[in-house]
Amino acid sequence: MSYINIIEKSENSIELELVNDDHSLSNALKESLLSKKGVVIASYGVEHPVLHPETGRYISNPTLVLKTEGVLAEKVLKEALRDIIDLCSNCLEEL
């Protein structure tokens, strides 16, 4: 299971680590953030992944960097996460 480790946080920037993730949440979150007004930078990096012995998935701890201007970084991050949840909910309803 993934969880978030906040590395650094200020009003206009957040750097966080998504523990035991791959590109799935990291990329979706980056794309959602880039669509938001006031986002200056939304990017993530992934170290070389390792094979998880229980799941057989390649995992890593991607680091996401968000920088904003004129809007609180935490607020934009929460909006982007809600957008991803809404997208998944809509997909489930259509099945």
UniProtKB/Swiss-Prot annotation:
The gene is rpo11. Belongs to the archaeal Rpo11/eukaryotic RPB11/RPC19 RNA polymerase subunit family. DNA-dependent RNA polymerase (RNAP) catalyzes the transcription of DNA into RNA using the four ribonucleoside triphosphates as substrates. It is found in: Cytoplasm. Its EC number is 2.7.7.6. It comes from the Archaea. GO terms for biological process: DNA-templated transcription. The keyword Chaperone does not apply. Its main location: cytoplasm. This is DNA-directed RNA polymerase subunit Rpo11. One of its GO terms (cellular component) is cytoplasm. The keyword Metal-binding does not apply. It catalyses: RNA(n) + a ribonucleoside 5'-triphosphate = RNA(n+1) + diphosphate. One of its GO terms (molecular function) is protein dimerization activity. Pfam families: RNA_pol_L_2. Signal peptide: none annotated. Disulfide bonds: none annotated. Part of the RNA polymerase complex. Keywords: Cytoplasm, DNA-directed RNA polymerase, Nucleotidyltransferase, Transcription, Transferase.
